[in-house]
Amino acid sequence: MKRILALLTSFIISSSILHAQEVNTTESWSGAITIGTNKLNIGFNLLSLSDGKQACTMDVPEQGANNIPTEIIKNDADSLSISITALRATYKGRKNSAESIVGQFSQNGMSFPLSLTPGKVELTRPQTPKQPYPYATEEVVFKNEAEGAVLSGTLTYPITYGFQVKETIPVVLLVTGSGGQNRDEEIFNHKPFLVIADYLAKHGIASLRYDDRGVAQSTGPTQGTTTENNLSDAEAGISYLRNLNKFGQIGVLGHSEGGTIAFMMGANKSVDFLISLAGGAADGLKILVGQNKASMQLQGIPAIVIEQYATALNILYKDRIGGKQIADHKQYVEDLCQANKLTLPENLKANLAKCITFGGEWITWFLAYDPSEAIRKIACPTMALNGTLDMQVLSKDNLPVIKENLPANDKHLIKEYDSLNHLFQHCAPATALSYGAIEETISKEVLEDIANWINSLK
């Protein structure tokens, strides 16, 4: 139960099952279970429906899961009993008073004390800026005419805007990581891009962040899109900023896939400077196999099993890059293991079978892409950052590629931060992937380094 519930990420379910009934009242209770040295917040929402019946949903905000359907087994003056079928879990509690329920949360044969008090789970995010902001923001729209995309975003002006010559004010386009994300790159109630935009504005730097296609108010085709399409949207954002004629140097800051896109934009000579936050520099195959190995090591899986799984995954992904047609996924995995003398447990074989098609065209393109060629073409000042505890884009696999291929420039800054994860949060090895459980959104040192480096380019 290193992750409550490892199954949980598969059940980020909306409350649509309740839409047929109007909710008259909601009574929320919350508490936390302790797993080793980690705390995980859990909330239950008891709903009174218009037909007189009761319903209940469960929230685990650190894992981005809200409104998970549950079944109320018993709810009377003395006790509360809930079944969470999707997670094979239960909660049984005794009501001590109107302010306290003491009970046990059980899943897969393990049980954890869980005391509840009235109120919803509230995650603490101390770095998220609160309005009113001491700087101006503007809601904007720009178009990628070539691909029929319309992107909505926020242009944030620095505090000093209007008091400086505009040619001295740099502006940065913020590009999110993989998957559809909003302009704040929001994850587990963290809003990294909002925090970055706020910090930059307070240090004389403008920024534009935008919702990805199909997210919030942004529109455009999403079926079958790859990193190249996301690059095209980012290039449209840069063109928009240039046409505004409001700023001086125009750069890009990308995180994860966005960091790789930043390298591509540098190769295209479309930006004056670039910042890659945990951007992939190694080829996609190496990145994905590496992150799988790192995740398995965190889970305490034996080294021999990890190496066998990595061998199988490497072969499978190479077949996928080559366009091999696989009709029977289960049989393909069995044949692969037999041919390579791999003795993997059934659950890992099932994972391999899913990897044959998982992620669609985006993953297939990503696996085959090697950013090093783009990096060799970069002429503009480049900042590339990674954390030693990044389990998604491993610094040991990526920073050396950047150092080896990036043409010399005394304005470059390549830096590795000790004990920072993929989101640049401080963490321990065991909590490197526990993004939601960490209150810090992004290291202050990273924010300072970004702002200082951009301002040094003026």
Residue ranges and their predicted role:
Residues 22-95, 100-108, 127, 164, ...:
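Central antiparallel beta-sheet cores of small beta-barrel/beta-sandwich binding domains
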Residues 121-167:
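N-terminal cap/lid segment of alpha/beta-hydrolase-fold proteins
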Residues 163-166, 178-201, 208, 284, ...:
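Short substrate-entry loop that stabilizes the transition state in hydrolases
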Residues 224-244:
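Alpha/beta-hydrolase active-site loop
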Residues 237-301:
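Primarily recognizes the serine-hydrolase "nucleophile elbow" in alpha/beta-hydrolase
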Residues 277-377:
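Accessory cap/linker subdomain of secreted extracellular hydrolases
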Residues 378, 384-386:
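Short beta-strand/loop motif that positions the catalytic acidic residue
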Residues 380, 391-405:
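Short alpha-helix in the alpha/beta-hydrolase fold that links the catalytic acid
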